[in-house]
């Protein structure tokens, strides 16, 4: 599948969107009018893993289907007008804190998803019912649709706010969530396969979801997912706890059908078009356009790393080798509306997504893929964990991790952190330039920097390394407006070539690091385009 087409469609669609006197099964069906198929069957996670193992032992069969003509013909506005009726919401009749609603098939979503309700340890499939949907401007109101059509996915909301969902699962293995800001942004996926290899990328599908009815006083919704693709089948358990920072506690069991070249665990998918450090696509009236502005990593060795994102001229792939990482994620650190000026999509409210392994993941690497884009509806940034050992057929790969969605990740360094990266033409103001150089200004705040900025005797220095070229005009000076420091340097690229240059920077005093490590990758322009004005 063409990644650009798939991700543009998926991103846009996800952005839209007393004591009973009867047995609970009967009460739920009667109260919300949900039709059910078959009889309730015993269910647990071990059974679901068995189902995934059976899938992996059989040849893969595509789950996509040809939709009825009226659904195939829907345009974007028509599909967006279809809404699930509140009076048919799952668990709407009870006293619990949560409800679930379902997405209709159509437009880009051709893979039917079977959805089950779990009550008292037994699962029963929920039937598609045209009466459960308000078809709005879609033109489907009077059309007959198959009773076994199925759903495209689901969304969760609280009983106190039935109009705004806090999590949604829709399209392939994509899902999203929000923190207290209530603004969707980047997405997560169940699995990434062969992302950024240069060949076709594989997008596994969740083909079934099992939603466990929460206890009335529970703050957590438990969802199970069955995943399938040509390369792998898998079983997932999501424990979703809503809050200011939404937590997803995830267990997954993967069963490869064949060897996988590049397996991505805990994949985060985001968008970066233009920002302070990268204005290659700066024709828009808004100064910055991005869901996230950097990749943060807390390595197994305890180092904190910040890698600002870019919209590169060509596909860019980076791997950060590690062992037993403590966490990583795509973050939106810049929370200033004035830096975005978009009062429609509110980029300053987009959630960070932090991935925290629950146990040792062994050797591997955090991998970052950056893809050129001219369109903010295309998710062009992907970050994930890639195990060093390539999965083989017949193996069981068990991975447990937590996802945190919100304005701030749960873990933070005691050291100062990077708050801004800016770049531009180098040289000394007022003096004629004799050669081309590129200026980097990196701002740090937090930690001990506020106190050091007030101390005239403080000796703070920038520790700088580059893989190619030379550096000049290197400095580190207090930036009182931030109660921090600004590191500045000019990078002079080699005379020939446009090979990428890796940069590493941090601040220290008396031999002790004061900041997280700032990493960057810069592609110098061709010599013919190196204007010095």
Swiss-Prot record:
Pathway: Glycan metabolism; osmoregulated periplasmic glucan (OPG) biosynthesis. GO terms for molecular function: carbohydrate binding; catalytic activity. Its main location: periplasm. One of its GO terms (cellular component) is outer membrane-bounded periplasmic space. It comes from the Bacteria. One of its GO terms (biological process) is beta-glucan biosynthetic process. The keyword Signal applies. It is found in: Periplasm. Keywords: Periplasm, Signal. It holds the Pfam family MdoG. InterPro entries: Gal_mutarotase_sf_dom, GH-type_carb-bd, Glucan_biosyn_MdoD, Glucan_biosyn_MdoG/MdoD, Glucan_biosyn_MdoG_C, Ig-like_fold, Ig_E-set, TAT_signal. Predicted to be exported by the Tat system. The position of the signal peptide cleavage has not been experimentally proven. Residues 1-28 form the signal peptide. The keyword Signal applies. Probably involved in the control of the structural glucose backbone of osmoregulated periplasmic glucans (OPGs). HAMAP family: MdoD_OpgD. Belongs to the OpgD/OpgG family. This is Glucans biosynthesis protein D. It comes from Xanthomonas axonopodis pv. citri (strain 306). The gene is opgD.
């Amino acid at each position: 599948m063409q990644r650009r087409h798939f991700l543009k469609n998926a991103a846009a669609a996800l952005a839209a969107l007393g004591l009973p006197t009867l047995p609970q099964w009967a009460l739920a069906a009667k109260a919300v009018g949900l039709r059910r198929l078959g009889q309730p069957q015993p269910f647990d996670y071990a059974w679901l893993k068995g189902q995934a193992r059976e899938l992996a032992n059989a040849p893969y069969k595509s789950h996509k289907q040809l939709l009825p003509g009226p659904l195939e013909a829907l345009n974007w506005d028509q599909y967006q007008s279809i809404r699930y009726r509140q009076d048919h919401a799952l668990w709407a009749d009870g006293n619990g804190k949560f409800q679930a609603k379902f997405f209709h098939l159509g437009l880009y979503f051709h893979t039917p998803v079977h959805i089950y309700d779990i009550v008292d340890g037994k699962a029963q499939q929920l039937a598609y019912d045209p009466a459960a949907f308000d078809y709005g401007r879609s033109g489907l109101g009077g059309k007959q649709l198959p009773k076994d059509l199925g759903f495209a996915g689901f969304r969760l909301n609280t009983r106190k706010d039935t109009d705004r969902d806090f999590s949604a699962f829709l399209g392939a293995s994509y899902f999203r969530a929000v923190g207290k800001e209530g603004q969707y942004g980047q997405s997560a996926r169940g699995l990434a396969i062969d992302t950024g290899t240069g060949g076709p990328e594989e997008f596994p599908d969740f083909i079934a979801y099992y939603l466990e009815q929460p206890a009335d006083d529970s703050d957590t919704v438990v969802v199970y997912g069955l995943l399938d693709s040509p390369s792998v089948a898998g079983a997932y358990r999501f424990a979703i706890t809503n809050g200011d920072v939404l937590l997803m506690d995830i267990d997954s069991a993967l069963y490869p059908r064949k060897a996988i070249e590049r397996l991505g665990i805990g994949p985060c998918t985001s968008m970066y078009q233009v920002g302070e450090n990268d204005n290659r696509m700066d024709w828009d009236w808004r100064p910055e356009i991005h869901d996230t502005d950097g990749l943060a990593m807390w390595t197994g060795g305890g180092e904190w790393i910040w890698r600002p994102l870019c919209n590169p001229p060509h596909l860019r792939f980076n791997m950060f080798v590690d062992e037993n990482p403590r966490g990583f994620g795509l973050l939106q650190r810049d929370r200033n509306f004035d830096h975005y000026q978009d009062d429609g999509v509110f980029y300053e409210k987009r959630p960070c997504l932090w991935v925290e392994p629950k146990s040792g993941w062994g050797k591997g690497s955090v991998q970052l893929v950056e893809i050129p884009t001219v369109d903010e509806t295309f998710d062009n940034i992907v970050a994930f964990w890639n195990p060093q050992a390539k999965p083989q057929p017949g193996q069981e790969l068990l991975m447990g991790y937590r996802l945190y969605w919100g304005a701030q990740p749960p873990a933070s360094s005691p050291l100062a952190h990077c708050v801004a990266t800016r770049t531009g033409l180098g040289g000394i103001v007022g003096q004629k330039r004799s050669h081309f150089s590129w200026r980097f200004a990196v701002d740090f705040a937090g930690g001990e920097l506020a106190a050091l900025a007030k101390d005239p005797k403080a000796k703070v220095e920038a520790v700088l390394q580059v893989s190619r070229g030379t550096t000049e005009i290197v400095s580190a000076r207090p930036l009182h407006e931030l109660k921090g420091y600004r590191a500045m340097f000019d990078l002079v690229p080699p005379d020939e070539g446009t090979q990428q240059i890796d940069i590493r920077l941090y601040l220290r005093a008396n031999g002790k690091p004061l900041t997280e490590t700032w990493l960057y990758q810069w592609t110098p322009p061709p010599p013919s385009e190196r204007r010095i004005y």
